[in-house]
Amino acid sequence: MDVLEMLRASASGSYNTIFSDAWCQYVSKQITATMYMYCAFGLMGVLFLAWFMYFKRLARLRLRDELARSISSVTNSYGDLRGLRFRKRDKMLFYGRRMLRKMKNVSGQMYSSGKGYKRRAVMRFARRILQLRRDNMPLEMRTVEPPAEYLEETIEGSDRVPPDALYMLQSIRIFGHFEKPIFLRLCKHTQLLELMAGDYLFKITDPDDSVYIVQSGMINVYISNADGSTLSLKTVRKGESVTSLLSFIDVLSGNPSYYKTVTAKAIEKSVVIRLPMQAFEEVFQDNPDVMIRVIQVIMIRLQRVLFTALRNYLGLNAELVQNHMRYKSVSTMSGPINSQTSQSSRQATANGPPMVINQLNLMQSAASGLGMGMGTGTGSGVSVTVTRPPPSPSRHSREEHTLSDPNPNPDGSVHGTSNLFTEVHGDAPNADLFHQQQQSVGNLSTRRSSITQMTPDGSHTCPQAPGVTTSIDMRLVQSSAVDSLRKELGLSEEDAHIIEPFVELRELEPNVTLITEGNADDVCVWFVMTGTLAVYQSNQDATRAKQDKNDMLIHFVHPGEIVGGLAMLTGEASAYTIRSRSNSRIAFIRRAAIYQIMRQRPRIVLDLGNGVVRRLSPLVRQCDYALDWIFLESGRAVYRQDESSDSTYIVLSGRMRSVITHPGGKKEIVGEYGKGDLVGIVEMITETSRTTTVMAVRDSELAKLPEGLFNAIKLRYPIVVTKLISFLSHRFLGSMQTRSGSGAPGAPVEANPVTHKYSTVALVPITDEVPLTPFTYELYHSLCAIGPVLRLTSDVVRKQLGPNIFEAANEYRLTSWLAQQEDRNIITLYQCDSSLSAWTQRCMRQADVILIVGLGDRSHLVGKFEREIDRLAMRTQKELVLLYPEATNAKPANTLSWLNARPWVTKHHHVLCVKRIFTRKSQYRINDLYSRVLLSEPNMHSDFSRLARWLTGNSIGLVLGGGGARGAAHIGMLKAIQEAGIPVDMVGGVSIGALMGALWCSERNITTVTQKAREWSKKMTKWFLQLLDLTYPITSMFSGREFNKTIHDTFGDVSIEDLWIPYFTLTTDITASCHRIHTNGSLWRYVRSSMSLSGYMPPLCDPKDGHLLLDGGYVNNLPGHLWRYCRASMSIAGVFPPFCDYRDGHLLLDGCYTNNVPADVMHNLGAAHIIAIDVGSQDDTDLTNYGDDLSGWWLLYKKWNPFTSPVKVPDLPDIQSRLAYVSCVRQLEEVKNSDYCEYIRPPIDKYKTLAFGSFDEIRDVGYVFGKNYFENMAKAGRLGRFNQWFNKEPPKRVNHASLNEYTFIDLAQIVCRLPETYAVNTAELFSEDEDCDGYISEPTTLNTDRRRIQVPRAGNSLSFSETEMDSDVELDLKLERKMDKSTQSTPPTSSRASVRGKEEARHMDNWHWSVKHKVETASGATEATNAMIDQEQQHQQQADQGVGAEQLADKDEDKENRSSTYNETKN
């Protein structure tokens, strides 16, 4: 613009057009310049286009010329082509290829050009601008609901069976299994009774001789007290029965009783089926084996149901038996003069008045006793005169059974002794007779017997014992013992020769233990001749057991009484410990001898059972009317939701599942109950309706305890209330400690309070390639370090119970035998066959959990056999076990494919196997290999030990809390834990703990974990990368891209399912406002979510449901592809953005906001013992009290004025942070006070949250602190809770019985002389040897020491196959021959051996003879040979201790006598 023109214009006064003119001029110049430029570019473009078209046309002309030249050359070579024909086949081929080429071009254009191509290009550009990512989410686990049968009970019934017959069948099942002909015979005796409301079914003084089954209506059973009041015991509904099994024994033994206190009355119109007990008597006459089995079942029910319920749960011990002496006909040295038949002895026992044991009157029998042989007990000899006081009208066949009777002896002492003593001395005739007999005995100078005296405390002593054997002819004592035991067994005089060879005598000093509780070897029937025995039982109350380690006294056994009949009839171990209370003499018969007598005289079981019943207290008889024994098949419901709660249940065997139905119809598992658990007790006590439905997972047995009986016992015995309060307090305390973490939306099924302790485990192979036998051996080896365990295979079961044991006729015997094995072991392993055999189906029915074993590096497809497993056991929990060879160093991968193909699997395990598992060997070589492996100590850190602890409910969990850079201390603590020998079975973490825990679960090597953690910490110190990640702080300060990259580089695309150790992380779901537990999915994403601290990182969006997840420490700071959930667990709010879950879209933040130490979550997932490491920061609680109001200007003045004292007042961010961690602090306090968690906090408070550069220093602090901490725990004895199972010495043979010692004794088989199932088939014996390819002939095979093989097994020796057992038999026979040679070559010792030593040697020889006889009858059984070896060793020891030549000669003479007696008996 010209300045002069502007000045002129301004001088002329027209200022309004100056600026507009200048602007127009400037614009016109610019437009002109631009137009010239566009014209130049346009011209250049036209010239370029013309040149391009000319070039393309020139190229086309050149190509045409070349084609013409090539055609001309072809024409010149082959002549004119116009005469050639284009065949149809060639034409079709030519045009087909041409069309396909066009289709390819068209499809290529669709993906490379057009609208779709442009749209994708725009989307790619938008992602670059908006930092979006392509949706290439990895494979995720399918969320499949369990099948309906898993949570629903079976409702359908049996329509083919009439209701009356069905109720009849179910009711008499308590007597055992009856075959169809016998059942039909029993049905012929049934009667139908129609009762109106108010009618009596039976009342007091009515005969107790029937079984009543309610077909319709309801019956009330109540008792009458002495004061005239009544108390209801139970209400019998449709299908239930009213009977007393103890009365059943009374009727069969010929002593029918009457109802003393029990009455049954109809509540409404009812129809009742009556089955007289005499009907069983008719059946038993033709089928003695059925009688034996019924008596055995009744005794088993008495021990398992009555004693279990009253003792373990109600705290009753001494109240269950008669503490006073049972009055009966007793003879301490009775001879054949006063002997009676079995009928007379039984009637005298039942109907006779109280008897008094008087001293011996040997005046008249001394001479005859000296002159006659007493070997057989049939001649006359010395007898004991037993007198009775006059009958008392107040005492008859049985005393009154009422709960109102005074408690006889709660402390175990005999209060009734003084009364009995007063009866003896106070009654004139009896007192005179007593003194006369005493004087007559005192006048006997040449031969005196042991005088039984009654001391003031009620015990019976033998003043001259034990030296009395020097003055009494032992043959007279032997004859007296034979006659007494004959009467106790109900045998006649003619049957004395049957038991005489088996009766043994023993002199006891005070405090000599005859048998201990749980011992199955030394079971005998003991008869007290002189002195007193005391019966004890261990204290079931854990608190009292710690305070008082002595056993509890139950009752005394006085002269003339027997003990041991219960264990003899049940065939199980002794339930009591029996000791001598004073100098005593006893006569006893061993179990093997009793069973041999039983084969000839089956009815002795009635007398043995009657002896057990006589000892029981009136309380037990009344409980027998009320307690029910319930059998439930799989799927049957015990009770249903909203039903009335009038009883509680005790699980005797099997497994129960509790399911709650929500108002919307959704079902959820509440809990599971195993053997010994109490079900429904809370609803019964609070008198509320059932809150859940409880059903049987597998075939189960339960004891039903009615509310009426429970109330009656409470009123009579207040100790029951104390026991119940203690039981419920422990249950409520445990529920309070686990309540907070059980209801999380993200928690799986395992998060419910389900008991992960199994009694039976079935092992099923997926394919034939799975080495199932070595796998079972390895698992068995690891379980032996925890407790007694048993391994069962089809071969072992057939070896023990016979080849036809899986047939339907042997159902009772097989079931009882398996139940006995489960009772004796903490866990039983059922190794299934590779096909769906009868044994495999039995394993499915018996299993609490099924382990499906497969090879992790093979195909994940589901086989046909595996689908049948799910069909047969729909309600049984199934877990997948994947095996990996150690040599390949392979890591688990593709686990999601395995789980998605098997929606019925609830949990999976990765197991790293040693080389020997995958070595292909014959069955015999495998057994020989593991016979040596079992001698070694198992590795507590192996995957097999981890699986063993999970199955037994002893898993050890490690919880790592959040704390930023202070999390480096976790690495040092991990190293200290490893050096302390503490195994880690489960890992959970929050925030930085999620990262460190995931590294440990992935690598399991402390060196590799340290290196990766150090590299990640170094990346976090590179601030320039963090500066590049800054973004506009709307949601967070950083975008999170670089942070995600660091976590993804650490883990890669690994899923949580692929980790070696079970792992979980916890995040805060800000979409649903709760914490979430992640046990599957992308690892790095959920670790990132758990580290998303608010304000720094944006929440992670959960890809499952779209929820926003933050750091889980906000709610619980100690708790797909792995890195995603690690990233989600580290999403610090405000620093990193929340992580969006790829499954549901929820936003996830750091888990520290809800639970910074999720030990409660770990406990709910099944960990029994937990180590929780907290590295979080601690808030300052010492704040300034500024009054009612606060001025910010005053705070500013205090802050900037250096001459004033500083004040501690939280600022706004600090207040927001404290509010966010309110839930976390409360959760942390509950964890510190729990009894299942060991809370540890290293001294790392001086380090800041972002001090990642001090990684090594913080790690060393954690290591030093952890090492000292665990050393102090070991010194204090508190470290055993984490590795107590592996500090035991190798189990010894004497403490762990072999397989045959645990064999179920079927008395019915003994009585009816069924074919022996122990016989070895020669063809079967060598069939397996042929498959061994000659390995059995190796010299190391037959030289294996049997005892060396049995040393390492804490359980039973069921883990050997038939071949190995047969080799043991051969070895036993060789050892036996060596023993015989060594015994014969033993030189005689000095002739000064005492008479007592001679008698003990004779008794030992008697034992040896009985075992020898058992070997002959068992036809080579392993049990007999093992017992024979033991007896031969004891025989050898006895000979070494000083048995002279005279003693050996006497023993040889006794051998010949007994052998001749045995031959006569056998003929």
Swiss-Prot record:
Highest taxon above the source species: Eukaryota
Motif interval(s): DGA/G: 1111-1113
Chain positions of motif GXGXXG: 962-967
Basic and acidic residues bias (residue ranges): 1396-1406, 1448-1458
Composition bias type Polar residues, residue spans: 1382-1393
MF annotations from Gene Ontology: lysophospholipase activity; protein kinase A catalytic subunit binding
Amino-acid positions noted as binding a nucleoside 3',5'-cyclic phosphate 2 in the UniProt annotation, renumbered to this chain: 488-615
Parts of the chain on the Cytoplasmic side: 56-1467
Protein name per Swiss-Prot or TrEMBL: Neuropathy target esterase sws
Organism: Drosophila yakuba (Fruit fly)
